[in-house]
Amino acid sequence: MQTHLLILSFLLSCVTLHAGPATEKVAFESDTRGMTKEEVKEYMGRGPDESITPHLWRYSGSWTSTVFGEGMSTYNTVDISFGMLTDSHKYGVMEYTWSIQ
């Protein structure tokens, strides 16, 4: 039962983290729809083709899995990276990077 609650809380937090950037993307697109690339650069304070440094959340814990065989069944840390890439008139291609350390 406790495992189910942990999984449910993790899924709810993922939905919460995903909702913020999506709202910002819609606001950005409506604000910049008729702008030139130079106007977008002035609006953003940086070049619109520059990528934004991703935000990073780290889950530290351990769990086991027998899928990978002996010696690879325990994981201690998972990094979840939510990065945003931009082009001339877009904000927010969501990028999910999972790395097991």
Regions found by a protein language model. Give the residues of each.
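Residues within mature, well-folded domains
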Residues: 19-101
